[in-house]
Structures are given as structure tokens and as C-alpha cells.
Amino acid sequence: MEPSKQEVPKLMETPPNISNDSSATEKGEATRQQQLPNNRYALTVDEVIEQHIGALGFAQILHALLVSIAWIFDAQTTLISIFSDAQPAARLLATGAIVEGASLCGLASGEWEWIGPKSDTVVSEWNLICQHKFLVAVPSTLFFIGSLFGSGVYGYLADSWFGRKKTLLLSCVLTFVTAFAISFSPNVWVYAFLRFANGFFRSGIGSCCIVLATEIVGKKWRGQVGQYGFFFFTLGFLSLPLMAYLERKSWRNLYRIISFLPLGYAVCLLPFAYESPRWLLVKGRNKEAMVVLKKLARLNGKQLPADLSLVDPIPERDDQTSSSEKFWKTKWAVKRIIMVMMAGFGSGFVYYGIQLNAENLNFNLYLTVAVNALMEFPAVFIGSFLLGVMNRRPLFSNSSYLAGFACLLCAVLSIHRVIRAISVAKWLQLAVEAVGFMASSTAYDVLYVYCVELFPTNVRNTAVSLLRQAFMLGASAAPLLVALGRESAMMSFIVFGVASVLSGIVSLWLRETRNAPLYETLAQQGKAEEIENETIMIT
């Protein structure tokens, strides 16, 4: 059966000088109803949500909160190295004077000591200074490289064999195993290997969380729901300075504490989450998809019509292998994912780089990280509001520009003679860095939501996972630049600033998706966008 034509936004995948009239989308989609035998009719999942369940109700909010809790552990696992791999303060034994990290290299081992026990961080325990200073960047770099590879594996599993929910469960359990194992590392090389494994296994959390949360809400609320999920990432980030301060004498205990949280979530809370009805439908499990939709409707105080069926998005059922092959053979999809990944590389590089670079500011590490974490809250609020009133493309690009310019200003404020000339330079640098981090956080979060809307259901998790791979590839380069920043903070901020501006420029060639429908298959989306482009060319 062929669905009747839907009204789609008149947008074209070109640089942003082409205006678009979003008011056309506000007229709503024409209801598509397919008459079936026995007086039954079929709707798409989008239509069932909009017409019978509600675009956003108690059920969707509760479900989004439930699956988004896992972002807490993702943040803790990702950013723990800010504290576990930091270089602690040292002092001269003769005078008790504080010694800068670079100055230790000219001293004999008996002339100085770490302030506090050697178990504070991996740097003090294994003496990763001077000729070994770049070794401290290896574990974090391998963590993000592991996340890069893991994202591809989890994306395939979530779109094919396991679905979103089981993949999230698997990722949480394996995150616990590897994080707990890290606390027993005997040397930096075992530590680095286990960080790689930890990054690999935790990489399924983020993509599954955002897809599970957004696939059951109406198109008007997709951006906001995707953004609100990042509140939990912020909570995880904000919890780190407190936990790190309480366990500041043992980086091993810090790892043990954060390791048990994802296990508790996987056992106690995740079983109550629903699998995505869109994924169930694409896999031919129509009855299970209807069961989930009925539960959502019931929680919203509504009931689905007894004669309702779901439109099969794949009349001739393909297996996942053919869907993956079609993804890489579909020209518009490949072009789009390349641009998304290019923007994601710069965004991930800057977002994680600013956080890891906190120790290179002229400020207290715990306070700096806490300020950065607090800036995530206005970033989410502002991003959520702007997603409701602005197009995705300019929102991402402008946020990237702001983050880039803030980093460049931080570079100027890092010059020693500027710090000496301006008495409030340290506070000003912290404020500018916080604004830059807020902007980079907004860009990072918006790009997640943007990617969800750019691709259809049968490859959506794969696309989001590829974006995460780009994020992680960018993030894997950040620790090396942070290590360089210990010698030249100005240089690290300059590189972060340029990368952020470039990622914003790349995004200008992405298609706008605000208020556009979510399609189920590549063929369905390609056909709709082709008709849309032809219409624009005619008009």
C-alpha cells in the first residue's frame, strides 16, 4: 500500500543563504490513513503519537527521565580523568615553597615531594612528569579512541540485533566491569588499556539514551526532550568535583565509587523502560510495537482505537545487513553523515578539550570544574528554548562561533604579561572560559538532536553512533593538546578556538530539520526529500 503524500517543510540541503518558510510546517501533516480489510486503518508511528497518544505527555516525560539517568554515569566515566590524571602540587623539601610542574624537571628526586600522598592521582603514583609527562595523556586518548570504535559496534547492535534498550543495558553492565577493574591497575600501561576498554563499552550509553527518549515524542518536542536528557549528563559532571574532593587521597577509590552506579541503574531502573516502537516496527515486530504504544497511551490517560494498525515502513522486509549496505550506497545519506561527522569532530574536540583543559587555567581545579558543570544548566535551558524557536543549523553554527571566539579570548588572557597587567585577569579568564564552555555544550547537545532528525529509523542509531565516533575522535586529540597546554596554555586555547569556528562553518551545508517528520526508511526519506527539492526548484 502506498501512503498518500505528506506536507513536508520546504527546505534544501544548501548553504544557509537560502531562506526557508517554517510556517508551512505549522499547518500540520495531512492525515495518512490506509484502509485495511475488516474496516481497519493504518497510521504511521508519528501519526499515532500526534493524533492518539499526545505529542508530549506524562508517559513520554517519565520514559525520557528514566532512560536519561544513564547520562550521569556516562559523564562520570568520561570526565573522571580531570581529577584522576591531574598533576598535584609539589614543594621543595628545603624551603617548603610550592614548585610548578615544569620546574620539577631541574630538581633531583630528593629535593622535592608531592603535597599529599602519592595515591592522589596517577601522575603522583607513577611519577608521570618531565620526560614521562606525555604518558599521562595516553589513557585519556585511548579512552576516547575506545569510545570511537565502540560507538560503531553499539550502533550496529542497537539498529539490528539487540535494539536500543538491550544495548543500553549491555553498555551499563560492561561499563561497571571495566571501571571497577581500572581501580586495580598496577601501572600506567594496564591503566591505559583498561581505559580503552572502558571507553569502548560505555560508548553505547549516550546514543541509546537520546534515541530512546526522542523516538516516542511528537516532532514539536523532539529537540526539547533530547536537550533535557543532557541535564543528567550535567548532574554527573557536577557530582565529580564533590566525589573527587571527598576521595582526593585515592584515585582508585574514586573509580570504585563511580563503577557501581551504572550496575545499580541497569538492575533497578532500566527494566522499566520501553523498547522503541519505531525499531520494533522496522524489525517486523508490529504487535510488540502496538503494545508499547498502547502502554504510552494508557499512561497519558488515552486509548488507541481498536481498529488501528501501523503502516509497515518496509513492505518487502529487508534484513539489517541490507539496510546498512543501502546506507553506504545512498549518496545523500553518505554526504550528510560525512558533514555531520566533520562538525562532530570539531565539536567533540572543543567540548571535551575545554573540560580537560581546566587544569591549565590559573585557578583552583575543583572550583573551575564545578563552574563548568554549573554552566551546563543554562546551556541546556537556553538550548532547549532556542530549539523551539530557531532552526537547528544556525543554532549549532552560532554556538560554535561563540565557543571559538571565547577560546581565542582565553588565549589572550593566558599571556603572562596580560595576567600581570590586569589584576582581575584570572577571574576574567574563568568567566570567558565558562561562557565558551556553555556555548560548546549547547553546540554539542544540539548536534545530537540534529543528527537524530537527519536520518530515518532503520539507520538512526547507526548515524548517531557515527556522530559519537566523530565526537570521540575529536576528544581523543584533546588530552594531547591539554598536555601541551601545561607548557603553553595560550596555544591550546588557540587550537580549540579555530576548531570550533571551523565546525560551525561545516554545518552550514546540512539540511534544516526543524518540524520535519521522522521517516522510517532511507527510501521513504529520500523520496520525500527529492519531491521537496523538486518543488523548491519549481517555485
From Swiss-Prot:
Keywords: ATP-binding, Cell membrane, Developmental protein, Ion transport, Membrane, Nucleotide-binding, Transmembrane, Transmembrane helix, Transport. It is a multi-pass membrane protein. Induction: Accumulates in embryo upon imbibition. Residues 1-35 are annotated as: Disordered. InterPro entries: MFS_dom, MFS_sugar_transport-like, MFS_trans_sf. The chain crosses the membrane at residues 53-73, 134-154, 173-193, 196-218, 225-245, 257-277, 337-357, 369-389, 395-415, 435-455, 464-484, 490-510. Residues 1-10 have a biased composition (Basic and acidic residues). GO terms for molecular function: ATP binding; carnitine transmembrane transporter activity. It is found in: Cell membrane. Residues 74-133, 194-195, 246-256, 358-368, 416-434, 485-489 are extracellular. ATP binds at A213, T214, E215, I216, V217, G218, K219, K220. Pfam families: Sugar_tr. One of its GO terms (biological process) is leaf senescence. Residues 1-52, 155-172, 219-224, 278-336, 390-394, 456-463, 511-539 are cytoplasmic. Coiled coil: none annotated. The keyword Membrane applies. One of its GO terms (cellular component) is plasma membrane. It comes from the Eukaryota. High affinity carnitine transporter involved in the active cellular uptake of carnitine. Also transports organic cations. Regulates lateral root development. Belongs to the major facilitator (TC 2.A.1) superfamily. Organic cation transporter (TC 2.A.1.19) family. This is Organic cation/carnitine transporter 1. It comes from Arabidopsis thaliana (Mouse-ear cress).
